[in-house]
UniProtKB/Swiss-Prot annotation:
It catalyses: chlorophyllide a + oxidized 2[4Fe-4S]-[ferredoxin] + 2 ADP + 2 phosphate = protochlorophyllide a + reduced 2[4Fe-4S]-[ferredoxin] + 2 ATP + 2 H2O. The active site is at 282 (proton donor). The lineage of its organism: Bacteria, Pseudomonadati, Pseudomonadota, Alphaproteobacteria, Hyphomicrobiales. This is Light-independent protochlorophyllide reductase subunit B. Binds 1 [4Fe-4S] cluster per heterodimer. The cluster is bound at the heterodimer interface by residues from both subunits. The gene is bchB. The keyword Cell inner membrane does not apply. Its EC number is 1.3.7.7. Component of the dark-operative protochlorophyllide reductase (DPOR) that uses Mg-ATP and reduced ferredoxin to reduce ring D of protochlorophyllide (Pchlide) to form chlorophyllide a (Chlide). This reaction is light-independent. The NB-protein (BchN-BchB) is the catalytic component of the complex. [4Fe-4S] cluster binds at residue 36. Protochlorophyllide reductase is composed of three subunits; BchL, BchN and BchB. Forms a heterotetramer of two BchB and two BchN subunits. Keywords: 4Fe-4S, ATP-binding, Bacteriochlorophyll biosynthesis, Chlorophyll biosynthesis, Iron, Iron-sulfur, Metal-binding, Nucleotide-binding, Oxidoreductase, Photosynthesis.
Length: 508
Protein backbone atom coordinates (compact mmCIF):
# COMPACT_ATOMS: atom_id res chain seq x y z
CA UNK A 1 0.00 0.00 0.00
CA UNK A 2 1.24 3.51 -0.84
CA UNK A 3 0.30 6.84 0.72
CA UNK A 4 -0.16 9.44 -2.00
CA UNK A 5 -2.13 12.58 -2.78
CA UNK A 6 -3.06 11.40 -6.29
CA UNK A 7 -3.98 8.08 -7.88
CA UNK A 8 -4.69 7.37 -11.53
CA UNK A 9 -7.13 4.59 -10.67
CA UNK A 10 -9.36 4.04 -7.67
CA UNK A 11 -9.93 0.64 -6.04
CA UNK A 12 -11.81 -2.05 -8.02
CA UNK A 13 -15.21 -1.27 -6.50
CA UNK A 14 -15.06 2.18 -8.14
CA UNK A 15 -14.79 0.40 -11.50
CA UNK A 16 -17.84 -1.68 -10.58
CA UNK A 17 -19.67 1.53 -9.71
CA UNK A 18 -18.82 2.98 -13.13
CA UNK A 19 -20.49 0.01 -14.81
CA UNK A 20 -23.52 0.02 -12.49
CA UNK A 21 -23.98 3.79 -12.86
CA UNK A 22 -23.84 3.49 -16.65
CA UNK A 23 -26.60 0.87 -16.80
CA UNK A 24 -30.34 0.80 -16.14
CA UNK A 25 -32.20 -1.52 -13.74
CA UNK A 26 -28.98 -2.59 -12.00
CA UNK A 27 -28.19 -1.93 -8.34
CA UNK A 28 -24.94 -2.40 -6.45
CA UNK A 29 -24.90 -3.23 -2.73
CA UNK A 30 -21.46 -2.42 -1.38
CA UNK A 31 -20.25 -3.69 1.98
CA UNK A 32 -18.20 -0.70 3.10
CA UNK A 33 -17.38 1.48 6.11
CA UNK A 34 -18.55 5.07 6.37
CA UNK A 35 -15.43 6.53 4.76
CA UNK A 36 -15.82 4.62 1.49
CA UNK A 37 -18.96 6.49 0.40
CA UNK A 38 -16.76 9.24 -1.11
CA UNK A 39 -17.11 7.65 -4.55
CA UNK A 40 -20.56 9.19 -5.03
CA UNK A 41 -18.89 12.56 -5.54
CA UNK A 42 -17.04 11.28 -8.60
CA UNK A 43 -20.35 10.91 -10.41
CA UNK A 44 -22.38 13.82 -9.05
CA UNK A 45 -19.67 16.48 -8.75
CA UNK A 46 -17.15 15.59 -11.47
CA UNK A 47 -19.31 13.91 -14.13
CA UNK A 48 -22.27 16.11 -13.12
CA UNK A 49 -24.83 13.32 -13.32
CA UNK A 50 -28.36 14.34 -12.43
CA UNK A 51 -28.76 11.41 -10.03
CA UNK A 52 -26.69 9.47 -7.53
CA UNK A 53 -25.10 6.23 -8.72
CA UNK A 54 -27.27 3.14 -8.04
CA UNK A 55 -25.22 2.06 -5.04
CA UNK A 56 -26.30 1.26 -1.48
CA UNK A 57 -23.64 1.09 1.24
CA UNK A 58 -23.80 -0.86 4.47
CA UNK A 59 -21.73 1.95 6.07
CA UNK A 60 -20.68 -0.03 9.11
CA UNK A 61 -18.84 1.74 11.91
CA UNK A 62 -16.06 0.62 14.23
CA UNK A 63 -18.57 -0.34 16.91
CA UNK A 64 -20.32 -2.69 14.42
CA UNK A 65 -17.21 -4.83 14.13
CA UNK A 66 -17.93 -6.30 17.53
CA UNK A 67 -21.37 -7.43 16.34
CA UNK A 68 -22.78 -9.20 13.29
CA UNK A 69 -21.71 -7.31 10.15
CA UNK A 70 -23.04 -10.18 8.01
CA UNK A 71 -26.55 -9.52 9.29
CA UNK A 72 -26.06 -5.82 8.56
CA UNK A 73 -25.16 -6.65 4.96
CA UNK A 74 -28.19 -8.93 4.49
CA UNK A 75 -30.52 -6.32 5.92
CA UNK A 76 -29.07 -3.65 3.63
CA UNK A 77 -29.35 -5.89 0.54
CA UNK A 78 -32.97 -6.77 1.33
CA UNK A 79 -33.91 -3.13 1.83
CA UNK A 80 -32.11 -2.09 -1.37
CA UNK A 81 -34.03 -4.66 -3.41
CA UNK A 82 -37.39 -3.67 -1.92
CA UNK A 83 -36.73 0.02 -2.52
CA UNK A 84 -35.18 0.01 -6.00
CA UNK A 85 -36.61 -3.21 -7.54
CA UNK A 86 -33.61 -3.83 -9.84
CA UNK A 87 -33.48 -6.58 -12.46
CA UNK A 88 -29.95 -7.50 -11.35
CA UNK A 89 -28.23 -7.05 -8.01
CA UNK A 90 -24.46 -6.63 -7.84
CA UNK A 91 -22.92 -7.33 -4.43
CA UNK A 92 -19.37 -6.87 -3.21
CA UNK A 93 -17.00 -5.38 -0.68
CA UNK A 94 -14.90 -2.26 -0.71
CA UNK A 95 -11.17 -2.64 -0.18
CA UNK A 96 -11.57 -1.96 3.55
CA UNK A 97 -14.49 -4.36 4.01
CA UNK A 98 -12.59 -7.17 2.28
CA UNK A 99 -10.53 -7.48 5.44
CA UNK A 100 -13.48 -8.78 7.50
CA UNK A 101 -14.29 -11.49 4.88
CA UNK A 102 -18.08 -11.49 5.17
CA UNK A 103 -18.73 -13.13 1.72
CA UNK A 104 -21.37 -10.73 0.31
CA UNK A 105 -22.15 -13.13 -2.56
CA UNK A 106 -23.09 -16.01 -0.28
CA UNK A 107 -25.02 -13.75 2.08
CA UNK A 108 -27.05 -12.20 -0.76
CA UNK A 109 -27.85 -15.57 -2.34
CA UNK A 110 -29.08 -16.72 1.06
CA UNK A 111 -31.81 -14.08 0.92
CA UNK A 112 -33.54 -15.88 -1.96
CA UNK A 113 -34.21 -12.68 -3.92
CA UNK A 114 -36.23 -13.11 -7.15
CA UNK A 115 -33.52 -11.47 -9.32
CA UNK A 116 -30.05 -12.61 -10.37
CA UNK A 117 -27.43 -11.86 -7.71
CA UNK A 118 -23.97 -11.29 -9.19
CA UNK A 119 -21.11 -11.42 -6.66
CA UNK A 120 -18.04 -9.32 -7.41
CA UNK A 121 -14.86 -10.63 -5.84
CA UNK A 122 -11.84 -8.41 -6.35
CA UNK A 123 -8.34 -8.63 -4.97
CA UNK A 124 -8.68 -5.04 -3.89
CA UNK A 125 -5.09 -4.65 -2.70
CA UNK A 126 -3.65 -6.03 -5.94
CA UNK A 127 -6.09 -4.76 -8.59
CA UNK A 128 -7.51 -1.38 -9.49
CA UNK A 129 -10.40 0.47 -11.07
CA UNK A 130 -10.24 -0.65 -14.70
CA UNK A 131 -9.87 -4.27 -13.64
CA UNK A 132 -12.98 -3.86 -11.48
CA UNK A 133 -14.95 -2.38 -14.37
CA UNK A 134 -13.80 -5.13 -16.74
CA UNK A 135 -14.64 -7.96 -14.34
CA UNK A 136 -18.04 -6.46 -13.49
CA UNK A 137 -19.03 -6.13 -17.14
CA UNK A 138 -17.72 -9.62 -17.89
CA UNK A 139 -19.78 -11.13 -15.05
CA UNK A 140 -22.91 -9.29 -16.18
CA UNK A 141 -22.49 -10.44 -19.78
CA UNK A 142 -21.94 -14.04 -18.72
CA UNK A 143 -25.01 -13.91 -16.49
CA UNK A 144 -27.43 -12.57 -19.11
CA UNK A 145 -26.08 -13.28 -22.63
CA UNK A 146 -27.44 -16.81 -22.96
CA UNK A 147 -27.79 -18.89 -26.13
CA UNK A 148 -30.24 -17.61 -28.74
CA UNK A 149 -33.49 -19.44 -29.41
CA UNK A 150 -33.02 -18.71 -33.13
CA UNK A 151 -29.48 -18.97 -34.57
CA UNK A 152 -28.24 -15.81 -36.28
CA UNK A 153 -27.67 -17.65 -39.55
CA UNK A 154 -31.37 -18.51 -39.90
CA UNK A 155 -32.72 -15.09 -39.01
CA UNK A 156 -33.64 -12.64 -41.75
CA UNK A 157 -31.23 -9.72 -41.66
CA UNK A 158 -32.11 -6.62 -43.66
CA UNK A 159 -28.84 -5.04 -42.56
CA UNK A 160 -25.90 -6.25 -40.47
CA UNK A 161 -25.78 -5.19 -36.83
CA UNK A 162 -23.15 -4.87 -34.12
CA UNK A 163 -22.75 -4.20 -30.41
CA UNK A 164 -20.73 -1.24 -29.13
CA UNK A 165 -18.90 -2.35 -26.00
CA UNK A 166 -16.95 -0.58 -23.29
CA UNK A 167 -18.49 2.85 -22.64
CA UNK A 168 -19.09 3.54 -18.93
CA UNK A 169 -19.87 6.33 -16.52
CA UNK A 170 -16.86 8.56 -15.76
CA UNK A 171 -15.32 7.62 -19.12
CA UNK A 172 -13.37 10.20 -21.10
CA UNK A 173 -15.86 11.49 -23.73
CA UNK A 174 -17.57 8.07 -23.91
CA UNK A 175 -21.04 9.58 -24.40
CA UNK A 176 -19.92 11.67 -27.37
CA UNK A 177 -17.84 8.86 -28.88
CA UNK A 178 -20.86 6.54 -28.90
CA UNK A 179 -22.90 9.14 -30.77
CA UNK A 180 -20.22 9.65 -33.44
CA UNK A 181 -19.55 5.93 -33.94
CA UNK A 182 -23.28 5.21 -34.22
CA UNK A 183 -23.70 7.90 -36.89
CA UNK A 184 -20.71 6.56 -38.85
CA UNK A 185 -22.00 2.98 -38.72
CA UNK A 186 -25.42 4.12 -39.90
CA UNK A 187 -23.85 5.84 -42.91
CA UNK A 188 -21.95 2.63 -43.64
CA UNK A 189 -25.14 0.57 -43.45
CA UNK A 190 -24.57 -1.15 -40.09
CA UNK A 191 -27.12 -0.99 -37.28
CA UNK A 192 -26.28 -0.83 -33.59
CA UNK A 193 -27.95 -3.68 -31.72
CA UNK A 194 -26.86 -2.81 -28.16
CA UNK A 195 -24.51 -0.27 -26.61
CA UNK A 196 -23.21 -1.60 -23.30
CA UNK A 197 -22.63 -0.96 -20.47
CA UNK A 198 -23.64 2.68 -21.12
CA UNK A 199 -27.43 2.87 -21.37
CA UNK A 200 -28.02 -0.90 -21.33
CA UNK A 201 -30.28 -2.91 -19.03
CA UNK A 202 -30.04 -6.61 -18.11
CA UNK A 203 -32.70 -7.29 -20.77
CA UNK A 204 -30.47 -5.58 -23.34
CA UNK A 205 -27.50 -7.73 -22.31
CA UNK A 206 -29.62 -10.80 -23.07
CA UNK A 207 -29.87 -9.52 -26.66
CA UNK A 208 -26.11 -9.14 -27.17
CA UNK A 209 -25.82 -12.47 -29.08
CA UNK A 210 -28.27 -11.19 -31.71
CA UNK A 211 -25.60 -8.95 -33.28
CA UNK A 212 -23.38 -10.13 -36.12
CA UNK A 213 -20.18 -8.83 -34.49
CA UNK A 214 -18.89 -6.75 -31.59
CA UNK A 215 -16.93 -3.50 -31.61
CA UNK A 216 -14.58 -3.03 -28.65
CA UNK A 217 -14.31 0.72 -28.21
CA UNK A 218 -12.56 0.63 -24.83
CA UNK A 219 -10.54 -2.57 -24.28
CA UNK A 220 -9.80 -1.73 -20.64
CA UNK A 221 -13.49 -2.40 -19.90
CA UNK A 222 -14.85 -4.58 -22.69
CA UNK A 223 -12.11 -6.80 -24.13
CA UNK A 224 -12.59 -9.71 -21.72
CA UNK A 225 -16.37 -9.76 -22.19
CA UNK A 226 -16.00 -9.49 -25.98
CA UNK A 227 -13.57 -12.40 -26.06
CA UNK A 228 -16.11 -14.49 -24.12
CA UNK A 229 -18.86 -13.55 -26.61
CA UNK A 230 -16.54 -14.58 -29.43
CA UNK A 231 -15.86 -17.99 -27.88
CA UNK A 232 -19.44 -18.64 -26.79
CA UNK A 233 -21.55 -17.04 -29.52
CA UNK A 234 -19.07 -16.98 -32.44
CA UNK A 235 -19.22 -13.20 -32.75
CA UNK A 236 -16.14 -11.67 -34.43
CA UNK A 237 -14.41 -8.67 -32.86
CA UNK A 238 -13.45 -5.26 -34.20
CA UNK A 239 -10.45 -4.19 -32.11
CA UNK A 240 -9.52 -0.98 -33.95
CA UNK A 241 -10.38 2.16 -31.99
CA UNK A 242 -11.27 4.96 -34.46
CA UNK A 243 -9.18 7.73 -32.87
CA UNK A 244 -7.59 9.87 -35.57
CA UNK A 245 -8.17 9.89 -39.32
CA UNK A 246 -5.95 6.91 -40.15
CA UNK A 247 -7.46 4.71 -37.44
CA UNK A 248 -10.97 5.74 -38.51
CA UNK A 249 -10.23 4.61 -42.07
CA UNK A 250 -8.87 1.30 -40.73
CA UNK A 251 -11.96 0.96 -38.53
CA UNK A 252 -14.31 1.53 -41.48
CA UNK A 253 -12.47 -1.06 -43.57
CA UNK A 254 -12.52 -3.63 -40.75
CA UNK A 255 -16.25 -3.14 -40.09
CA UNK A 256 -17.06 -3.22 -43.81
CA UNK A 257 -15.14 -6.47 -44.23
CA UNK A 258 -17.09 -8.16 -41.43
CA UNK A 259 -20.41 -6.74 -42.64
CA UNK A 260 -19.81 -7.43 -46.34
CA UNK A 261 -20.17 -3.77 -47.31
CA UNK A 262 -18.27 -1.32 -49.52
CA UNK A 263 -16.20 1.11 -47.40
CA UNK A 264 -15.13 3.43 -50.24
CA UNK A 265 -17.93 6.04 -49.91
CA UNK A 266 -16.69 6.89 -46.39
CA UNK A 267 -12.97 6.99 -47.16
CA UNK A 268 -12.91 10.32 -48.97
CA UNK A 269 -10.40 13.02 -47.99
CA UNK A 270 -13.04 15.61 -47.03
CA UNK A 271 -14.42 13.71 -44.03
CA UNK A 272 -12.13 15.48 -41.53
CA UNK A 273 -10.41 18.85 -41.45
CA UNK A 274 -7.46 17.52 -39.44
CA UNK A 275 -5.45 16.40 -42.49
CA UNK A 276 -5.66 19.75 -44.27
CA UNK A 277 -5.25 21.81 -41.10
CA UNK A 278 -2.10 19.89 -40.17
CA UNK A 279 -0.62 20.75 -43.60
CA UNK A 280 -1.75 24.38 -43.62
CA UNK A 281 0.62 27.33 -43.32
CA UNK A 282 -0.14 28.23 -39.70
CA UNK A 283 0.62 24.67 -38.63
CA UNK A 284 3.96 24.15 -40.34
CA UNK A 285 5.88 25.48 -37.35
CA UNK A 286 4.41 22.61 -35.31
CA UNK A 287 6.31 19.97 -37.27
CA UNK A 288 8.80 18.15 -35.11
CA UNK A 289 7.50 19.47 -31.79
CA UNK A 290 8.43 17.03 -29.02
CA UNK A 291 5.46 15.59 -27.16
CA UNK A 292 5.16 13.47 -24.01
CA UNK A 293 2.09 11.19 -23.78
CA UNK A 294 0.64 9.46 -20.72
CA UNK A 295 -2.80 7.99 -20.01
CA UNK A 296 -4.79 4.80 -20.25
CA UNK A 297 -3.44 2.38 -22.85
CA UNK A 298 -6.20 2.94 -25.43
CA UNK A 299 -5.87 6.71 -25.56
CA UNK A 300 -2.09 6.85 -25.07
CA UNK A 301 -1.35 4.46 -27.96
CA UNK A 302 -3.83 6.28 -30.20
CA UNK A 303 -2.44 9.69 -29.23
CA UNK A 304 1.10 8.62 -30.13
CA UNK A 305 -0.08 7.42 -33.53
CA UNK A 306 -2.02 10.63 -34.27
CA UNK A 307 0.79 12.86 -33.00
CA UNK A 308 3.49 11.22 -35.10
CA UNK A 309 1.63 10.29 -38.30
CA UNK A 310 -1.05 12.96 -38.62
CA UNK A 311 0.33 16.06 -36.90
CA UNK A 312 4.05 15.63 -37.51
CA UNK A 313 5.03 15.74 -33.84
CA UNK A 314 7.98 13.81 -32.43
CA UNK A 315 6.96 11.41 -29.66
CA UNK A 316 9.57 12.01 -26.96
CA UNK A 317 7.96 9.87 -24.26
CA UNK A 318 5.08 7.41 -23.97
CA UNK A 319 3.59 5.77 -20.91
CA UNK A 320 0.50 4.44 -19.17
CA UNK A 321 -0.85 3.52 -15.76
CA UNK A 322 -2.67 0.51 -17.30
CA UNK A 323 -0.48 -2.38 -16.13
CA UNK A 324 -2.88 -4.90 -17.70
CA UNK A 325 -1.87 -3.50 -21.11
CA UNK A 326 1.85 -3.13 -20.45
CA UNK A 327 2.75 -5.49 -23.31
CA UNK A 328 0.75 -3.45 -25.83
CA UNK A 329 2.25 -0.22 -24.49
CA UNK A 330 5.82 -1.50 -24.83
CA UNK A 331 5.13 -2.64 -28.39
CA UNK A 332 3.72 0.78 -29.25
CA UNK A 333 6.67 2.60 -27.66
CA UNK A 334 9.11 0.47 -29.62
CA UNK A 335 7.69 1.95 -32.85
CA UNK A 336 9.16 5.30 -31.75
CA UNK A 337 12.40 3.80 -30.38
CA UNK A 338 11.24 4.46 -26.82
CA UNK A 339 10.89 2.52 -23.60
CA UNK A 340 7.33 2.76 -22.28
CA UNK A 341 6.87 4.25 -18.81
CA UNK A 342 4.50 1.89 -16.99
CA UNK A 343 3.70 3.36 -13.58
CA UNK A 344 0.89 4.59 -11.37
CA UNK A 345 3.17 6.96 -9.45
CA UNK A 346 2.63 10.53 -10.61
CA UNK A 347 6.02 11.55 -9.20
CA UNK A 348 7.75 9.22 -11.67
CA UNK A 349 5.74 10.77 -14.48
CA UNK A 350 6.66 14.27 -13.32
CA UNK A 351 10.35 13.36 -13.14
CA UNK A 352 10.22 11.96 -16.69
CA UNK A 353 8.52 15.07 -18.05
CA UNK A 354 11.10 17.26 -16.31
CA UNK A 355 13.92 15.16 -17.74
CA UNK A 356 12.59 15.16 -21.32
CA UNK A 357 11.49 18.83 -21.39
CA UNK A 358 8.88 18.28 -24.16
CA UNK A 359 7.11 21.14 -25.88
CA UNK A 360 3.65 19.60 -25.35
CA UNK A 361 2.24 17.20 -22.76
CA UNK A 362 -0.76 14.97 -23.52
CA UNK A 363 -2.08 13.25 -20.42
CA UNK A 364 -4.59 13.09 -17.60
CA UNK A 365 -5.69 15.70 -15.10
CA UNK A 366 -2.46 15.17 -13.14
CA UNK A 367 -0.27 15.80 -16.20
CA UNK A 368 -2.20 19.04 -16.65
CA UNK A 369 -1.09 20.11 -13.15
CA UNK A 370 2.49 18.95 -13.76
CA UNK A 371 2.73 20.77 -17.09
CA UNK A 372 1.33 23.95 -15.58
CA UNK A 373 4.00 23.90 -12.87
CA UNK A 374 6.71 23.38 -15.48
CA UNK A 375 5.33 25.98 -17.89
CA UNK A 376 4.64 23.47 -20.68
CA UNK A 377 1.48 23.50 -22.86
CA UNK A 378 -0.82 20.57 -22.14
CA UNK A 379 -3.99 18.86 -23.40
CA UNK A 380 -6.01 16.16 -21.63
CA UNK A 381 -6.47 12.92 -23.59
CA UNK A 382 -7.46 10.34 -20.99
CA UNK A 383 -9.24 9.67 -17.72
CA UNK A 384 -8.92 10.43 -14.87
CA UNK A 385 -10.14 13.94 -15.59
CA UNK A 386 -11.79 16.80 -13.75
CA UNK A 387 -15.12 18.52 -14.26
CA UNK A 388 -14.01 20.65 -17.25
CA UNK A 389 -13.49 17.48 -19.30
CA UNK A 390 -17.16 16.56 -19.04
CA UNK A 391 -18.33 19.46 -21.22
CA UNK A 392 -21.96 20.30 -21.96
CA UNK A 393 -21.08 20.56 -25.67
CA UNK A 394 -20.52 17.66 -28.05
CA UNK A 395 -16.78 16.91 -27.89
CA UNK A 396 -15.88 13.38 -29.09
CA UNK A 397 -12.44 11.83 -29.52
CA UNK A 398 -13.44 9.17 -32.04
CA UNK A 399 -14.26 9.17 -35.77
CA UNK A 400 -13.79 12.19 -38.05
CA UNK A 401 -15.38 14.78 -35.79
CA UNK A 402 -13.22 13.45 -32.97
CA UNK A 403 -10.16 14.06 -35.15
CA UNK A 404 -11.24 17.69 -35.54
CA UNK A 405 -11.62 18.02 -31.77
CA UNK A 406 -8.19 16.46 -31.26
CA UNK A 407 -6.56 18.96 -33.63
CA UNK A 408 -8.11 21.91 -31.81
CA UNK A 409 -7.34 20.53 -28.34
CA UNK A 410 -3.70 19.69 -29.06
CA UNK A 411 -2.63 22.46 -31.39
CA UNK A 412 -4.28 25.48 -29.80
CA UNK A 413 -2.15 25.32 -26.61
CA UNK A 414 0.93 25.58 -28.84
CA UNK A 415 -0.56 28.46 -30.84
CA UNK A 416 -1.44 30.30 -27.64
CA UNK A 417 2.13 29.70 -26.58
CA UNK A 418 3.36 31.56 -29.65
CA UNK A 419 0.95 34.42 -29.00
CA UNK A 420 2.05 34.72 -25.39
CA UNK A 421 5.67 34.65 -26.52
CA UNK A 422 5.03 37.66 -28.80
CA UNK A 423 3.38 39.53 -25.94
CA UNK A 424 6.35 38.74 -23.72
CA UNK A 425 8.80 39.96 -26.37
CA UNK A 426 7.14 43.37 -26.51
CA UNK A 427 7.08 43.76 -22.73
CA UNK A 428 10.74 44.74 -22.99
CA UNK A 429 9.92 47.55 -25.45
CA UNK A 430 10.38 51.06 -24.02
CA UNK A 431 6.84 51.98 -25.04
CA UNK A 432 4.99 48.72 -24.24
CA UNK A 433 6.73 47.27 -21.18
CA UNK A 434 4.65 46.33 -18.10
CA UNK A 435 5.54 49.42 -16.07
CA UNK A 436 4.81 51.90 -18.87
CA UNK A 437 1.97 54.33 -18.12
CA UNK A 438 -0.76 54.92 -20.72
CA UNK A 439 0.59 57.21 -23.46
CA UNK A 440 -1.95 59.97 -22.80
CA UNK A 441 -0.78 60.34 -19.17
CA UNK A 442 2.67 61.54 -19.99
CA UNK A 443 6.01 60.12 -18.91
CA UNK A 444 5.87 57.16 -16.55
CA UNK A 445 7.87 57.18 -13.34
CA UNK A 446 10.77 54.79 -13.60
CA UNK A 447 10.54 51.80 -11.29
CA UNK A 448 13.22 49.42 -10.21
CA UNK A 449 13.36 46.25 -12.25
CA UNK A 450 13.64 43.04 -10.24
CA UNK A 451 16.45 40.78 -11.32
CA UNK A 452 15.98 37.02 -11.04
CA UNK A 453 18.78 35.79 -8.78
CA UNK A 454 18.92 32.05 -8.22
CA UNK A 455 20.37 30.77 -4.98
CA UNK A 456 23.67 29.77 -6.60
CA UNK A 457 24.09 31.65 -9.88
CA UNK A 458 23.39 35.26 -10.85
CA UNK A 459 22.17 36.49 -14.24
CA UNK A 460 23.15 39.90 -15.51
CA UNK A 461 20.44 42.20 -16.87
CA UNK A 462 21.34 41.55 -20.51
CA UNK A 463 21.13 37.79 -20.11
CA UNK A 464 17.77 38.14 -18.34
CA UNK A 465 16.41 40.25 -21.20
CA UNK A 466 17.66 37.73 -23.75
CA UNK A 467 16.12 34.86 -21.78
CA UNK A 468 12.73 36.61 -21.88
CA UNK A 469 12.90 36.67 -25.68
CA UNK A 470 12.89 32.86 -25.72
CA UNK A 471 9.37 31.34 -26.05
CA UNK A 472 7.99 30.67 -22.57
CA UNK A 473 7.25 27.03 -23.32
CA UNK A 474 10.98 26.28 -23.73
CA UNK A 475 12.29 29.07 -21.48
CA UNK A 476 12.50 26.81 -18.43
CA UNK A 477 14.60 24.32 -20.34
CA UNK A 478 16.90 27.10 -21.60
CA UNK A 479 17.36 28.46 -18.06
CA UNK A 480 18.16 25.03 -16.62
CA UNK A 481 20.60 24.16 -19.40
CA UNK A 482 22.40 27.50 -19.08
CA UNK A 483 22.71 27.25 -15.30
CA UNK A 484 23.99 23.68 -15.56
CA UNK A 485 26.54 24.81 -18.19
CA UNK A 486 27.70 27.66 -15.95
CA UNK A 487 27.96 25.45 -12.87
CA UNK A 488 30.04 22.87 -14.70
CA UNK A 489 32.49 25.58 -15.74
CA UNK A 490 32.51 27.50 -12.46
CA UNK A 491 31.10 30.71 -13.93
CA UNK A 492 29.77 33.01 -11.16
CA UNK A 493 27.76 35.29 -13.48
CA UNK A 494 25.65 34.31 -16.50
CA UNK A 495 25.96 36.72 -19.41
CA UNK A 496 24.51 36.74 -22.92
CA UNK A 497 27.65 34.97 -24.11
CA UNK A 498 27.11 32.22 -21.52
CA UNK A 499 23.52 31.80 -22.71
CA UNK A 500 24.57 31.35 -26.34
CA UNK A 501 27.51 29.11 -25.44
CA UNK A 502 25.16 26.84 -23.49
CA UNK A 503 22.72 26.78 -26.40
CA UNK A 504 25.47 25.74 -28.79
CA UNK A 505 26.76 23.13 -26.33
CA UNK A 506 23.39 21.39 -25.84
CA UNK A 507 22.44 21.62 -29.52
CA UNK A 508 25.27 19.31 -30.55
Amino acid sequence: MQLTLWTYEGPPHVGAMRVAAAMKDVHYVLHAPQGDTYADLLFTMIERRESRPPVTYTTFEARDLGGDTAALFQRTAQEAYERFKPKALLVGSSCTAELIQDDPGGLARGLGLPVPVIPLEFSAYQRKENFGASLTFYNLVRAFAKALATPRATRSAARPSCNLLGATALGFRHRDDIREVTLLLDRLGVGVNICAPLGASPDDLARLPEADFNIVLYPEVALEAAEWLKRTHRQPLVKTQPIGVGATHAFIEEVARLAGLDPRPLLGPAESRLEWYSRSVDSTYLTGKRVFIFGDATHAIAAARVASRELGFTVAGLGSYSREFAREMRAAAALYSLNALITDDYLEVEAEIERLQPELVLGTQMERHIAKRLGIPCAVISAPVHVQDFPARHSPQMVFEGANVIFDSWVHPLMMGLEEHLLTMFRGDEEFHDEAAPSHLGVAVATAQATHTPAILAWDAGAERELKSIPFFVRGKARRNTERYAQERGLPLITIETLYDAKAHYSR
